[in-house]
């Protein structure tokens, strides 16, 4: 692992469930100084209650200033106007962000930092923070999200890819597309906290009380219930197999009404990351019911490896990154395909198969991913 580096990381807000970004930076903070910059926003807020709550949370973050997570990791919430893609506003934000981030970096003790960004709209900050190198870490096709300024984001991302010293991409498709603009682009898959999710196999771990009385088998999902989740598919599976329990865990930011009329669908809401192994212990199969579109064909679902590290059989929509796990996960097409694949997964499951899935995830830890990334960073030059 790289050591004694200063890193300014631009990503989503630190608070919340761990993601690839938080896993990587938490590990790096063991030997390096990290300034994590909370999200500066990639879309304009709407008049929705969700956006109003988010703006209020941003206001509270601004008041907090620099927040210490551990001795080497601090979180900053700089001031920015949430109107991305507007030229005058983008220039203003660049000035505001440059001044505030330089201030926070000094307070956190950073010198000659690596600028490590997960966000295309930070391209205007390249060259302004005294950085030693620039890393663009692409984990999604951002222009495919709903409500974003697509053309502006594509232009920002292309400029960022061209200027980066190193580009990391979490799927082969993302890497191939960005390599057209920068040959220093590398595919680095997501990792998994194997020890955490493997707790699901422990006989001493009790399943959550709210799942104990549910009829088996339990077909489970955890994660954000968002635009890329095929709710119609889930509802139809539930109708076809009323003897199955469809258990959905996660915050929903879309209308889930199509599921609420199904007596065998249970929406439990968001649960703490620490409790997910216990919920996995209740699952008989883990599903990844994604819509197949421009966003998801470039995705590499974290939950794939998390389900497998919990020993679960997995049935997923047909995504390129899932296909690589043939023998560990099944891909399915449509309602008929999902029902048949789940039936097969249930019939072929057993303790030996669950242990084998956990063992297969051992080389895919977040620590291993950080070592892989560190080797790539060591191969890049330091900016003059």
Labelled PLM ranges:
Residues 255-280:
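Nucleotide-activated donor-binding/catalytic signature segment of Leloir-type glycosyltransferases, i.e.
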Residues 350-377:
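A charged, aromatic-enriched C-terminal amphipathic alpha-helix characteristic of glycosyltransferases
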């Amino acid at each position: 692992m790289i050591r004694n580096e200063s890193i300014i990381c631009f990503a989503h807000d630190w608070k919340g469930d761990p993601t690839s970004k938080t896993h990587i930076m938490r590990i790096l903070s063991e030997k390096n100084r990290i300034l994590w910059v909370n999200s500066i926003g990639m879309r304009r807020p709407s008049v929705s209650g969700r956006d109003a709550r988010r703006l209020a949370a941003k206001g509270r973050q601004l008041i907090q200033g620099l927040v210490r997570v551990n001795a080497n990791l601090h979180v900053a919430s700089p001031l920015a106007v949430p109107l991305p893609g507007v030229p005058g506003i983008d220039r203003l934000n660049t000035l505001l962000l440059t001044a505030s981030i330089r201030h926070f970096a000094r307070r956190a003790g950073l010198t000659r930092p690596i600028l490590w960004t997960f966000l295309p709209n930070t391209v205007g900050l390249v060259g302004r923070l005294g950085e030693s190198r620039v890393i663009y870490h692409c984990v999604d096709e951002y222009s495919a999200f709903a409500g974003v300024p697509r053309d502006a984001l594509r232009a920002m991302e292309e400029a960022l890819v061209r200027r980066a010293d190193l580009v990391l991409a979490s799927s082969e498709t993302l890497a191939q597309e960005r390599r057209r603009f920068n040959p220093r682009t590398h595919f680095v898959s997501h990792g998994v906290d194997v020890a955490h999710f493997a707790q699901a196999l422990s006989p001493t771990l009790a399943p959550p009380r709210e799942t104990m009385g549910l009829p088996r088998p339990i077909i489970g999902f955890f994660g954000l219930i968002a635009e890329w989740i095929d709710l119609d598919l889930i509802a139809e599976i539930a109708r076809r197999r009323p003897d199955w329990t469809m258990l959905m865990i996660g915050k929903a930011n879309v209308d889930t009404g199509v599921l609420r009329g199904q007596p065998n669908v249970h929406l439990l809401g968001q649960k703490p990351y620490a409790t997910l192994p216990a919920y996995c212990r209740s699952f008989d199969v883990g599903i990844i019911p994604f819509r197949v579109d421009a966003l998801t064909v470039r995705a590499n679902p974290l939950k794939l490896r998390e389900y497998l590290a919990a020993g679960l059989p997995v049935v997923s929509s047909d995504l390129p990154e899932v296909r690589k796990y043939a023998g560990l996960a099944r891909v399915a097409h449509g309602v008929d395909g999902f029902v048949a694949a789940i039936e097969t997964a249930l019939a072929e499951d057993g303790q030996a198969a669950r242990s084998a899935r956990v063992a297969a995830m051992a080389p895919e830890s977040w620590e291993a991913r950080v070592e892989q990334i560190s080797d790539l960073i060591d191969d890049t030059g330091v900016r003059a």
